Amino acid sequence: MSLSTLKNRRERGLLDGQFLIAMPGMEDRNFNRTVIYICAHSDAGAMGFVINRAQNLTFTDVLLHLDMIKDDDAIVLPPVARDFPIQTGGPVESGRGFVLHSDDYLSDGSIPVSDDISLTATLDIVRAISRGSGPKRATMLLGYAGWGAGQLEAEIGSNGWLNCPANEELIFDRSLDDKYERALALMGINAAMLSPHAGHA
């Protein structure tokens, strides 16, 4: 599933707004110990973002790459922009940036994902963040996770993933190191006790 499919969806799917939590036996390095926020799920596939993988880039790096600022301008960025988190969202279109954010900011390019969270992938939101006028809560993700028709369902059926309702606090929390364990805790699961062969919720 792609961003264009997300834009054109008419109803929410079964896994929309859910967390996928990788089982310990996940062999794909892209997804080992990941927590993924599912933005769209339908018969055509699914799309979501890894929310617990850091990126070796800063928001200043992104602005410089996009020619939005010059080197000398970086020192006058508002604190919210200097400290803005950049994360790895997944292996698909890994050079493309997406901003997952609270719904206090909406533009023509914003796509509602849930009642409180939207997704924007335009330069307008990047400019707004650089000026300190962006959403109150947000993170930029490079790339996304995508599945074709029936693929995610098959992976869940073979115990590749656990799923549970998403938690907004966890989505935007900037502490990534223990986010996997905290996502499991939402389900009452201790990561140390989780078997690679456990069933799914």
Curated annotation (Swiss-Prot):
One cellular component (GO) term of this entry: cytosol
Matches recorded under Pfam families: DUF179 (PF02622)
Membrane-spanning residues: none
Family matches, as InterPro entries: AlgH-like
Similarity section: Belongs to the UPF0301 (AlgH) family.
NCBIfam families found in the cross-reference section: PRK00228.1-4
Protein known as: UPF0301 protein Arad_1256
UniProt organism field: Rhizobium rhizogenes (strain K84 / ATCC BAA-868)
High-level lineage: Bacteria, Pseudomonadati, Pseudomonadota, Alphaproteobacteria, Hyphomicrobiales
